[in-house]
């Protein structure tokens, strides 16, 4: 009798352990996303959309931080942006990402203070570079956007800025493309919604 109880406990524990290991081994990757797998702390492979298998306790899914900005939902006119992480459960998006960065200020060639309101569209084309070549891709893209805006606007006077919104956007996009290629991203477009001058 006692032997049967011990056998039952053993088989229940064994079955639960197997089910737990199987549960940890199968990973679902949603459409238009990928996941990175590390084996014993080193990058091993990229999981594609669908059901994938990993080795539990030896391999793990990387959960990187890719920050982006959204306008404050309580005040849509405000350019005080809310930061948020684009990556949930290790799902790295391969679709186009929209960044509505906080207000940037720049000084034109004729010393006018300019506040360009822009939206940046980019895509992660190489998730390995996007995670391992840069600490936080979203913040880095934003800082690069800010610096590039200041450089582009700094060589133009106020009149050129007013009439050259599209030209400024294209120049910024090509400058960003070149710099961000090393981070595994493709800048698809930069739209300047409005340009305000300090009164």
Locate the predicted segments by residue.
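N-terminal hydrophobic membrane-entry segments
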Residues: 1-199
């Amino acid at each position: 009798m006692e032997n049967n109880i011990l056998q039952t406990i053993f088989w229940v524990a064994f079955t639960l352990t197997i089910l737990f290991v199987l549960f940890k081994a199968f990973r679902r990757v949603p459409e238009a996303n990928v996941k990175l797998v590390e084996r014993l702390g080193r990058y091993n492979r990229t999981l594609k959309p669908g059901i994938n298998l990993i080795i539990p306790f030896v391999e793990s899914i990387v959960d990187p931080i890719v920050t982006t900005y959204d306008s404050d939902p309580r005040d849509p006119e405000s350019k005080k942006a809310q930061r948020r992480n684009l990556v949930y459960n290790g799902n790295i998006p391969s679709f186009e990402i929209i960044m509505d960065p906080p207000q940037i200020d720049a000084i034109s060639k004729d010393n006018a203070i300019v506040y360009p309101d822009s939206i940046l569209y980019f895509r992660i084309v190489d998730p390995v570079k996007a995670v391992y070549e840069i600490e936080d891709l979203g913040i880095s893209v934003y800082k690069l956007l800010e610096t590039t805006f200041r450089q582009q606007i700094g060589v133009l006077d106020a009149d050129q800025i007013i009439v050259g919104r599209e030209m400024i956007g294209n120049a910024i996009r090509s400058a960003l493309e070149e710099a961000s290629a090393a981070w595994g991203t493709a800048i698809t477009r930069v739209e300047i919604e409005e340009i305000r001058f300090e009164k």
